[in-house]
Curated annotation (Swiss-Prot):
This is 8-amino-7-oxononanoate synthase. The gene is bioF. It catalyses: 6-carboxyhexanoyl-[ACP] + L-alanine + H(+) = (8S)-8-amino-7-oxononanoate + holo-[ACP] + CO2. Signal peptide: none annotated. Its EC number is 2.3.1.47.
Length: 384
């Protein structure tokens, strides 16, 4: 089989399964409204949970940062790309979340890959929740360590995996809020089992940080858990992009020496770090509290209103509200119907989610209003 035949076969298989991904160029894609092809849609696909991507204070901070530092960092943080703006953001994140150190990464995917690649050796074991993000599972699969997956949020299964002999160290990997189901991990129970077997816990709280807990400190803070490695990302609650790893001073020093994604990547622009500092200030403020309260009210309204529709609603109290449709083609058809009626909704299909669980991944944000939720509910009940 030639290269072209191999590529064509893979694409044909995706098309036949109604699983072919495509991108839509949008004029505006975050916040309450999405604009595409000169048409405006209510946006129920954005991860901008607090509606901060268009916050004037954050935009102004980025603009001022660009004027002060330029539009790029100029290199890796190990060369010339680590600015006083990066340093200040790291220190503020560490203080906010109660860690000694924070290290910035260009994306959550890079942060997860870097930590696992740097920490895990052949004699070690990773025990990962089966529904963990692709960045975590791919990194674990590519690492020389043994990968064992435990059933979703099943602490008993995790305990059995950790109890089996392992010549090296054990790392338990999970998410705070799961990206496709919107449910939360039982972090306190997971940490207890992990500690009983002398392991370390790594939590990716991409969808919890900024959105839940006191001052938006996230899933771990809410459940009174402090994992050895906490990954937070800035493309969701912060409304920007990038990520950070929170850890001890010793682990931070280790990652600075051995995390190749950190060493060999150009740092995020200092102006972006300034915008993230402004976003963090909003998240920690009374305004941040008000945005979280509004989002919680919208979630409650949606979950109450969707009852009686012909769809299976996932058990989620987060901004991620998946409606399980099952069949790929039906999910695509329903998403298209909703778009025709003015709501931008994304159909998520295998391999992103398990076979037979194609869904509409609805996301609510603090930028929405109650009438937006009511409009969505009206369309869902009418398109069942």
């Amino acid at each position: 089989m030639s290269w072209q035949e191999k590529i064509n076969a893979a694409l044909d298989a995706r098309r036949a399964a109604d699983a072919l991904r495509r991108r839509y160029p949008v004029a505006q894609g975050a916040g309450r409204w999405l604009v595409a092809d000169d048409r405006q849609y209510l946006n129920f696909s954005s991860n901008d949970y607090l509606g901060l991507s268009h916050h004037p204070q954050i935009i102004r901070a980025w603009q001022q940062g660009a004027e002060q530092f330029g539009v790029g960092s100029g290199g890796s943080g190990h060369v010339s790309g680590y600015s006083v703006a990066h340093q200040a953001l790291e220190e503020e994140l560490a203080e906010w979340l109660g860690y000694s150190r924070a290290l910035l990464f260009i994306s959550g995917f890079a942060a997860n890959q870097a930590v696992i690649a740097a920490m895990m050796a052949k004699e070690d074991r990773i025990a990962a929740d089966r529904l963990s993000h692709a960045s975590l599972l791919e990194a674990a699969s590519l690492s020389p360590s043994q990968l064992r997956r435990f059933a979703h949020n099943d602490v008993t299964h995790l305990a059995r995996l950790l109890a089996s002999p392992c010549p090296g160290q054990q790392m338990v990997v999970t998410e705070g809020v799961f990206s496709m189901d919107g449910d939360s991990a039982p972090l306190a129970e997971i940490q207890q089992v992990t500690q009983q077997h002398n392991g370390w816990l790594m939590v990716d709280d991409a969808h919890g940080t900024g959105v839940i807990g006191e001052q938006g400190r996230g899933s771990c803070w809410l459940q009174k858990v402090k994992p050895e490695l906490l990954v937070v990302t800035f493309g969701k609650g912060f409304g920007v992009s990038g990520a950070a790893v929170l850890c001890s001073s010793t682990v931070a020093d280790y990652l600075l020496q051995f995390a190749r994604h950190l060493i060999y990547s150009t740092s995020m622009p200092p102006a972006q770090a300034q915008a993230l500092r402004a976003s963090l200030a909003v998240i920690r403020s009374e305004e941040g509290d008000a945005r979280r309260e509004k989002l919680a009210a919208l979630i409650t309204r949606f979950r109450a209103g969707v009852q009686g529709s012909p769809f299976t609603l996932a058990d989620s109290r987060s901004a991620i509200q998946p409606l399980i449709v099952g069949d790929n083609s039906r999910a695509l058809q329903l998403a298209e119907k909703l778009r025709q009626q003015g709501c931008w909704v994304t159909a998520i299909r295998p391999p992103t989610v398990p076979a037979g669980t194609a869904r509409l991944r609805l996301t609510l944000t603090a930028a929405h209003e109650m009438q937006d939720i009511d409009r969505l509910l009206e369309m869902l009940h009418g398109n069942g």
